[in-house]
């Protein structure tokens, strides 16, 4: 499907510091995934974007194919690390467009502030980074509940997708469950350290680029603006 360009500096465990899949040609668009995810969160978007842009779909550190950070890494240190690796991957002053979902929204906004004026556009989908990342009474199930039961693990993946990301059961396909299961298994950093870190509003206030914020029609995030 999408070729894996893994031409990055690697760590002792032979993983890229921040893995990337590249596709298409044109101006650069960089995609940042959500918590317990990977570049595959953007599976349905990459081909469409690649008709106009060079798409760079990342695995954040400690996610997917990327190298692992220390367990005690704080949210602020994590954002600093991503920034250092990112400028190695994208040196120079060429314009950048960034898009981030949830956890990735907080990362993308932090980078947009640090890299201004290189970042010309920022698109955020139900972004994290508010001071509190609580979702009321969402009945999320723990993946630990499954133990070694693969069937139960996939059932929990399906349940949590409907609670957190997809409102229509018809959209929770086997492919969607595969993506969720793979992301959960390869998550090695607690995204809540960033998603609940309170950096988003301060970062947004300093931006001069074009910003678009999107929430799903049934997104119950406390930070979603009311529908008029």
Spans of features found by a protein language model:
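Gly/Ala-rich beta-loop-alpha elbow adjacent to hydrolase catalytic centers
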Residues: 100, 104, 108
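Conserved alpha/beta-hydrolase catalytic His-Asp/Glu region
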Residues: 151-209
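Conserved HGGG/HGGXW glycine-rich cap/lid loop of the alpha/beta-hydrolase fold
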Residues: 16-65
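N-terminal cap/lid segment of alpha/beta-hydrolase-fold proteins
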Residues: 1-17
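Flexible "cap/lid" loop of the alpha/beta hydrolase fold
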Residues: 109-113, 120-151
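Conserved loop-alpha-helix segment in the C-terminal half of the alpha/beta-hydrolase fold
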Residues: 215-228
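Conserved catalytic-core motifs of eukaryotic protein kinase domains, centered on the activation segment
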Residues: 41-43, 66-72, 133-136, 224-226
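Active-site loop/oxyanion-hole signature of alpha/beta-hydrolase fold enzymes
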Residues: 11-13, 56-100
């Amino acid at each position: 499907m999408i070729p894996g360009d893994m031409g990055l500096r690697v760590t002792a465990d032979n993983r890229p510091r921040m893995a990337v899949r590249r596709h298409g040609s044109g101006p650069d668009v960089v995609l940042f995934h959500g918590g317990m995810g990977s570049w595959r969160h953007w599976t349905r978007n990459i081909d469409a974007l690649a008709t106009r842009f060079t798409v760079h779909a990342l695995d954040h550190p400690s996610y997917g194919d990327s190298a692992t950070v220390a367990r005690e890494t704080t949210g602020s240190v994590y954002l600093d690390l991503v920034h250092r690796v990112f400028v190695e991957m994208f040196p120079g002053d060429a314009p950048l467009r960034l898009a981030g979902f949830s956890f990735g929204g907080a990362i993308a906004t932090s980078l947009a502030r640090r890299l201004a004026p290189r970042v010309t556009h920022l698109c955020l989908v139900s972004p994290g980074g508010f001071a509190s990342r609580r979702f009321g009474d969402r009945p999320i199930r723990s993946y630990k509940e499954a133990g070694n039961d693969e069937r139960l693990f996939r059932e929990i993946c399906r349940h949590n997708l409907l609670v957190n990301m997809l409102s229509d059961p018809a959209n929770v396909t086997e492919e969607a469950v595969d993506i969720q299961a793979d992301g959960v298994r390869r998550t090695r950093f607690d995204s809540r350290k960033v998603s609940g870190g309170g950096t988003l509003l301060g970062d947004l206030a300093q931006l001069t680029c074009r910003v678009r914020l999107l929430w799903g029609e049934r997104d119950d995030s406390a930070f979603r603006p009311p529908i008029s």
